[in-house]
């Protein structure tokens, strides 16, 4: 559920929504959501000073009932 929510959120703020993918991985530190976006959208997703990325992480933590990390990377 979290991966779909993050994907929907990010697809609405990027210029290339078809390049967005979110994969969920479980490890000993909790859940990890790996977000991949087009290189031209990475600045838009991270935001000035990381504000947008922090807002996305805050929304994810509010939706989750466990520890979740969100990693944002570009597709190369």
Spell out what each predicted region is.
Residues 1-44, 53-76:
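RNA-contacting regions in translation and RNA-metabolism proteins
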């Amino acid at each position: 559920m979290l991966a779909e929510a993050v994907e929907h959120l990010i697809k609405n703020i990027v210029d290339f929504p078809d390049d967005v993918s979110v994969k969920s991985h479980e490890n000993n530190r909790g859940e990890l959501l790996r977000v991949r976006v087009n290189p031209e959208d990475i600045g838009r997703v991270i935001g000035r000073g990381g504000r947008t990325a922090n807002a996305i992480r805050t929304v994810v933590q509010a939706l989750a009932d466990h520890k979740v990390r969100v990693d944002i990377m570009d597709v190369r």
